[in-house]
């Protein structure tokens, strides 16, 4: 796997302006391998800052309880009518936590919020998107 580069100064400035816009403080994000990782609390602040509502629904055709596979569809909408749909999934292959449905839901919501806020234009992910994105103590 190719090693990620450090975050460049232009990207740092863009992220800083996003962080200020959404009221993010240092506890709401961290850097890991050249990527900004937004915490659950940070995702909630971004959603409020964008006036986004998110609805979640299970996707039966991509869910198999007997195989411990779950898929949740998130639909994010702004007051201006912009809409984004995306998915969050969880299985034994990508989740080591004992509550896979919750993880699928968190991943779906986080992805929808990051997409509708345009933060995915930067090297940004939510901490819920992968176990390896959890902040190292």
For every predicted segment, state its role.
Residues 1-137:
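Polyanion-binding surfaces on beta-sheet-dominated domains and ring/shell assemblies
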């Amino acid at each position: 796997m190719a090693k990620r580069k450090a975050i460049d100064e232009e990207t740092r400035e863009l992220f800083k302006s996003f962080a200020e816009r959404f009221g993010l403080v240092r506890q709401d994000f961290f850097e890991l391998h050249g990527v900004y990782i937004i915490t659950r609390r940070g995702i909630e602040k971004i959603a409020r800052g964008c006036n986004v509502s998110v609805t979640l629904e299970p996707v039966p055709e991509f869910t198999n309880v007997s195989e411990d596979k779950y898929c949740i569809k998130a639909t994010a909408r702004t007051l201006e009518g912009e809409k984004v749909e995306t998915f969050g999934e969880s299985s034994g292959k990508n989740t080591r936590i004992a509550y896979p449905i919750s993880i699928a839901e968190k991943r779906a919501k986080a992805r929808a919020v990051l997409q509708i806020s345009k933060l995915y234009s930067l090297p940004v992910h939510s901490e819920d998107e992968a176990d390896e994105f959890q902040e190292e103590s």
